[in-house]
């Protein structure tokens, strides 16, 4: 290699190039010919884009390196690995996320969107690796390691969904005594009562929840804070409180100028519909179902309705009563069941819908018609007060300044016949008994460490702060646990 005697007289920044000069030149000339250049690449330590895109904060590069064999499990005194590489990778993964088998199935994987390999060919199958490691742990009965010392501090976790379970897990690892309070019969929150069971198998969900409880976490189900137990009692009995209430109250259709548009018994919310299905009350629906939404929840509703199908001559009150929680349907004869005609409308065009691309593709593959660029403008009712159709109109929707702007196209209205209309346009928090936390915007206000504003010792996370992904709720719980530990 020949070197020049050229002396670099231009002052360079620490990045080894002139500020403002971002044009890529021939690196070979600079590396091998200029005496002032470095002979090897310069590496800058920064968060990998996959990890930066993961709301749970998983050490993705870490466990992928273990799976690839780059990082080996530690050796024991006998010169053999102290554990299989699968367990080693699982333990690295669960430092942040205690529910990999569930998340490997339902997470839309924003980490894969941020993956560098997208610039070359396609992303690394991070979600599939997570799924595999979660299944391996269940099949081999892997358990979390209990803390060596206990702090003597007690923490109450309100809500047994992903945020509450994540917070309880992290707090238990830190040595705190944790009690989870949940109004339902079983823990899991939206993972159990919001996502269809065929996407989150109950045996898998139960196994991962039980592993958290095995750390010494106590669960008090069928207990609603604010009615069965007051918050004042909790503050007296516990050193800190975490609010993971979730957002399990659905939002009604936004029909302007008609307050009674959604009072028909066959116009329901997505949360009520999915809970009725997951509870086993809902066994079939009407022949024609219209779903209003565009996010992942609306895709769940549409696919469930399509799979449930309808039964000829079934009474409409059958499914209406089941969704309202008044009764359960008899098991329908499979041979008599036919697929429901399901239409999903969204104010956004299909390519701009909020649902994950693969969720949209799955829905279309199941025969669901997706109408992008249509907004609900009215509900057509019959003489009995039941809805017979949803009136929709074409529209143009865009986000401006963080707000949704929808422009209706005049003269484009039409009716979509419907036996059942489901509103899947968002969720709200039920603050019954805890009204003091309602900020008037459908949630509560917390600081960057997820401590509730003006409420020392009270922390929060998950949908109660911002209805979003399960992985976001898990991340909130972990950050709040750190705050509680410091508190």
Feature map (PLM): residue ranges:
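A glycine- and small/hydrophobic-rich beta-loop-beta segment
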Residues: 332, 367-371, 375-377, 381-389, ...
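A conserved short coil-to-beta-strand element within the FAD-binding core of flavoproteins
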Residues: 221-235, 373-385, 395-398
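Active-site rim loops that border cofactor/substrate pockets in soluble metabolic enzymes
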Residues: 388-409
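Beta1-alpha1 glycine-rich phosphate/pyrophosphate-binding loop at the start
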Residues: 49, 58-81, 90-92, 119-127, ...
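Rossmann-like dinucleotide/flavin-binding elements
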Residues: 157-181, 221-230, 249-250, 271-355, ...
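Ferredoxin-type iron-sulfur electron-transfer modules and their immediate structural context
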Residues: 1-154, 202, 241-260, 271, ...
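Alpha-helix C-terminal capping/helix-to-coil transition sites in glycosyltransferase folds
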Residues: 236-237, 417
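ANL superfamily adenylate-forming
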Residues: 262-274
